[in-house]
Amino acid sequence: MSRIVSRVITATIPGRPAAVRAWYLDLTNLRRVHPLIVAVRQVGTALAADGTAITDYLVTDRMVVAGLRIRFTYRVQISAPPEGPIATLARQAPRIRLVGQVTFTPTGDATTIQETLTIHAPWPLRRLVATEAEQAHSRMFAAMAALFATGADL
């Protein structure tokens, strides 16, 4: 049985694609809208020869599993070429990787944001990780849409 699960999460965010993309690229902003993230710290940056900005973060999540509140810290890398889709990579223990591609497409006066997540996880955790990631990112995009709709403190 495959250790890989894929999910696609789509939302419409009021705002121009460049503004939505720029806001999303600063992972410290996501702490305001992601239901699990409690801390974000940028730990490195690099610029690839093709102009892709690569930014590394340490992210701390808090979640409840089987009635237990757990807190864990993991690495996230965001790779953003000057234009187009961005790539994300989250590495969590034990042997969990979330590989993402995020696109920002103009839709009238708004932006359609689409995230394709490929989740690699050991069998006992696969369903939990996929469900939690999909729910958390759906809620994150809904909170982003609400924030952009009000224009509050972007």
Regions found by a protein language model. Give the residues of each.
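Short, surface-exposed coil-to-beta transition loops
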Residues: 6-8, 69-75, 96-101
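Hydrophobic pocket/interface hotspot
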Residues: 20-24, 30, 78, 113-115, ...
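Short amphipathic alpha-helical segments
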Residues: 16-22, 132, 136, 140
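Short, solvent-exposed secondary-structure boundary motifs
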Residues: 1-3, 30-36, 63-70, 90-95
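Beta-strand/loop substructures that line and gate deep hydrophobic ligand-binding cavities in soluble
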Residues: 89-138
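Beta-strand elements of well-folded, non-transmembrane domains
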Residues: 13-15, 61-65, 78-82, 94-96, ...
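Hydrophobic ligand-binding cavity/cleft-lining segments
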Residues: 1-53
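Glycine-rich portal/gate segments that line the openings of hydrophobic small-molecule binding cavities
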Residues: 42-91, 143-154
